[in-house]
Structure formats: C-alpha cells, structure tokens
Amino acid sequence: MARLKGQKVKECSFCGLSVAELGGNVVISNGVAICPECSKICHNLFKEKLSNPLDSKSNGLPTPKQLKDHLDMHVVGQEDAKKVLSVAVYNHYKRILKNNKYDNGIEIEKSNILLVGPTGSGKTLLAKTLAAEMNVPFAIADATTLTEAGYVGEDVENILLKLIHAAHGDVSLAEKGIIYIDEIDKIAKKNENVSITRDVSGEGVQQALLKIIEGTIANVPPRGGRKHPYEDTIEINTQNILFICGGAFVGLENIVKNRINKSSIGFSAIEKKNIREDTSLKYLEMEDLIKFGLIPEFVGRLPVHSYLEKLNKEDLMRILVDPQNSIIKQYYHMFKMDNVELVFEKDALESIVDEAILKNTGARGLRSILEGLLKDVMFEVPSISKTKKVIVTKESVLNTDINPLILVGNAIKKPWAKELYEINLKYDKK
C-alpha cells in the first residue's frame, strides 16, 4: 500500500516491526523504512545473485552467435576476432558451469586468449564488452608496469587485486571474472638467445605470469604492492579466471611473412606473392610468437589467438556514429542535457577521421580530438541561456583558432556564418 505524503513512518516497510520495537534503529528514505536485519537479508540476496552471474540470465548461457551479435552493436569491424572471442568465451563459461569436467570424467582445460592488433583497433573494447554481457567482473592490467618478484615495479599478483576490487571484494565472484592484460608484447625477451643478465621486465615477468594464467592458488596483498612475510593475504583460485592478453606486436607481421616465404609446404608461389605485410597476421603461428620473444611455455598458455586489422577511414567513420554507445552519440546527449542540439557537418566528421589517421591513434584518438575540438564550446554554452544549436564545421576541425558555430535563438553567435549541411546520424536510435 502506498504511503500518503506527510504520513509518518511507524514501522519497517519489510518486516513490519515498529520503529519503537526497533529502538528507532531504522533508515528512512522517500517514505520507506528498513531495519538493520532486513537490510542484511537484502544484502545477502544481492550477494548470492551476483556470485552466480552466469545463472542470472533468464535464457542461460548466451550462444556464440548471441555474443557476436552483442559485440556487433558496440564494435565496428574485426569480424574474425569477434567470432574467435565469442566461441572462446562461450566455451570457457560452459566449462565452468560443468565444473570443468565432462560426463566421463575428462577434465577440460582453460583456453586463454591472445589478441594481436595495432593501437586503437578495439582489443580492450572487445574484452570489456564481453565481460559486461556475461555479467562478470572485469579488470585491465598493463604489462609494462610488471616486474619479476624482488625488483622495483609491480608484482603480477596485483592484477588479481584489481579483479577482486571489481568484484567489490567478493573473491568467489572474482574467480569467475575476466582479466585483460594490455601491452603483452612489451614483456617479450629482448632477443631469442638466453641472456646471462636478468631481464626483469621481460622473460622474468612471463615466467611469473605463467602460474596465475594457467590456474593456481595465489596469495594477494590486500593493499597491493609487494608481499610481506607477516602480512595477511587474500587467497584466490585463478583456475576459472579467463585471461585475455593483447598487444600491437610491431614487427610480428614481418616475422610471419619471412616464415611463409621460406616455407616450401602449404603455400604456392602466387599465394606467397599475394600475402602482404598488413594481412600476414592471418597466418600467425605459435613459432612466430616465440621468434618475437614470448617464451614457449607462455605461448602455450594462450592457445586461442586472433588478429585485429588496422582500421581504415570507413571503419573510423562508422565508429564515430554507428555503435550503440558511439562517441558522437555520447557528446550529442551531453549537449542535450543543456537543451542544446549538437550537429556535425559531414566533411567535419571526415576531417576528424583524417586527423586520427594522420596521428596513427586509431579509434582511441577520436575522443581526444573531439574533446579538444569541443572544449571551448562546452565551457561557453551552459552560460548562454538561449543557445539552440552547436554546429561543428570542417573549418573548426582544421583550424584550432576557429570554434564550432553557436546558434543563439536564430542568430549565429560568431562572425563566420555560412551555409550549413547537417548529417543525419540518427542520434536517438536505440
């Protein structure tokens, strides 16, 4: 029964105990009261639901096709990587639901994933989007900050602490999560030959990562940093944590192409001639990764691998406007909160993409370009009461001294009025 406005709360809205019986120990908000015991019960119910994220979906485990369809809504292109990831994630969580064993007692091993592709091609976004769809904790780690135990830097166990934090301290939930380790190519050995000097940020880190990636009971310092002999630690089993490693692997395409050219089996002379450096990663083999500097044991822990192609101009244009959470849509709704319409000329969008290509920053650079472009306008607009529209022109993209046009009422609040060409981006498309 709804409580009338102004009616005094006299009991817990859940268990019915009076405020007097509870000694006044209740929390009241918007006419609803809850006592400590009911609050505790609600907390435990939520915790139980979160600790079984895979069971919380009404339709059970999403199929690989459903996972790819979800990725298509958020990530442009990269069809091969989407399929590989969708199948790998589906198999991983199917394995967990079966308690790692099949009917005849066969134990199914974990298959971690390696993504190879240039900066800004979507590696992190793919992993993050899948984790969100699977409703599991997700953490990102940077391999360049890791060093071998005993040296200045970050212990590999600290990446597990990030996952525990993402699970709000629930270790059992974290044990079903996903960790994305970026810049994994930066911990490659300096050369193929074993060195007599210590490579504390290369081979040493690979060795340290081996156990937690394949599955072990790890002890994590609760405050991060180095482990101390007398400090309490958090125990976490990594057997069911999915590790996705990614990196640009600059120069790997040459290693693949050289191997193919030297091979006398499997490729005709015409096929070899048609294999370009930018497409050679399609033929990536484990031996190429070892040649690059990853140790064989580490490569063996990443049996599933896929490559991401460098994004072209058409891809970047689509990334700006097509995905459900595209950058342009985000800025459009940001301005809409101030009752201002944000409009881009078509050639302005093309100029933004051209700048990202020139800087070689991929999709990641689009946001920083837009942020710099709209910075002054976002500062001015909230103070102008009659602002109706902001128009981003090609000139404002190419010339940092020119700001986008601001329409106040029906007049342009800038001296460089010109004919406008609006592009229909279907901002409100759901």
Swiss-Prot record:
Report the CDD domains cross-referenced here: RecA-like_ClpX (cd19497)
GO-annotated biological processes: cell division; proteolysis involved in protein catabolic process
Q: Which UniProt keywords apply?
A: ATP-binding, Chaperone, Metal-binding, Nucleotide-binding, Zinc
Q: Where does Zn(2+) bind?
A: C12, C15, C35, C38
Question: Per its UniProt entry, which superkingdom is the organism in?
Answer: Bacteria
Any idea which GO molecular function terms this record carries?
A: ATP binding; ATP hydrolysis activity; ATP-dependent protein folding chaperone; protein dimerization activity; unfolded protein binding; zinc ion binding
Question: Which residues are noted in the entry as ATP-binding?
Answer: P118, T119, G120, S121, G122, K123, T124, L125
Which residues belong to the signal peptide in this entry?
none
Q: Which positions fall inside the ClpX-type ZB domain?
A: 1-54
**GO cellular component terms listed in the entry, alphabetical order:** HslUV protease complex
A Pfam family annotated for this chain is: AAA_2
Q: What does the sequence similarity comment in the record state about its family?
A: Belongs to the ClpX chaperone family.
**Free-text function comment from the UniProt entry:** ATP-dependent specificity component of the Clp protease. It directs the protease to specific substrates. Can perform chaperone functions in the absence of ClpP.
Quaternary structure annotation from Swiss-Prot or TrEMBL: Component of the ClpX-ClpP complex. Forms a hexameric ring that, in the presence of ATP, binds to fourteen ClpP subunits assembled into a disk-like structure with a central cavity, resembling the structure of eukaryotic proteasomes.
Q: Quote the protein name from its UniProt record.
A: ATP-dependent Clp protease ATP-binding subunit ClpX
Native species of this protein?
Borrelia garinii subsp. bavariensis (strain ATCC BAA-2496 / DSM 23469 / PBi)
